[in-house]
Amino acid sequence: METILVCDDDREIVEAIDIYLSQEGYKVLKAYDGIEALEVLKNNEVHLLVIDVMMPRLDGLRATLKIRQESSIPIIILSAKSEDADKILGLNVGADDYVTKPFNPLELTARVKSQLRRYTKLGNKTAVNDSIYQAGGLVINDELKEVTVDGEHVKLTPIEYNILLLLVKNQGKVFSINQIYESIWNEEAIGADITVAVHIRHIREKIEGNPNDPRYLKVVWGVGYMIEKQ
């Protein structure tokens, strides 16, 4: 049974999410501020975090920053703010997805399932045979779910890994933002520009020696992104 931590200072929201996720067969742990969330994560195996932004003591953004120093579990941020700047900030600190309040519980449940599928796949470390994809010094072992650049291990979130794998598998092919979003999120790309752009920037920061002059992940202006054939 997969365990989900729900963190929000509004106890009614926590209870409502608990009901929906429990009905789907998930074990739900609860916290009511960022400090409590960190403590729960420290003492339990958690597979996904749903966390609110505005909370006392330690808010969701600062908590996410701290969590990302230790863990790559999927993080879905909840916020009453719907402005693009707030979404960018949430993704910048390491969140994988962003849901605006008020939200449809069925939509949140669907996003939880989607994120967990990626995380479960990324966490599968049993190798039966090699499935290696390489672009110069960039190597992806898709059986072990490992990425190295010039022999150095690179730690990616599940979303980042799947975007990079898509591009490396199709070296030389340009993918539009909508194509990337629909391939990875498996849903219609509506307002996907910011989400994809932030994840692309994070990938570059991790795989490129100089993200401003990328060696691997190139932008084709007005079209999309690609991994150049090496």
Short names for language-model regions:
Residues 44-51:
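Active-site beta3 strand of CheY-like receiver
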Residues 25-32, 40:
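Short hydrophobic/Thr-rich beta-strand motif most characteristic of the beta2 strand and flanking loop
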Residues 130, 155, 200, 204-230:
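DNA-binding patch around the recognition helix
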Residues 3, 114-174, 178:
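Short, Lys/Arg-enriched segments at the junction into DNA-binding effector domains
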Residues 32-36, 59-62, 86:
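Acidic catalytic/metal-coordinating carboxylates
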Residues 12-23:
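Charged docking surfaces used in two-component/phosphorelay signaling
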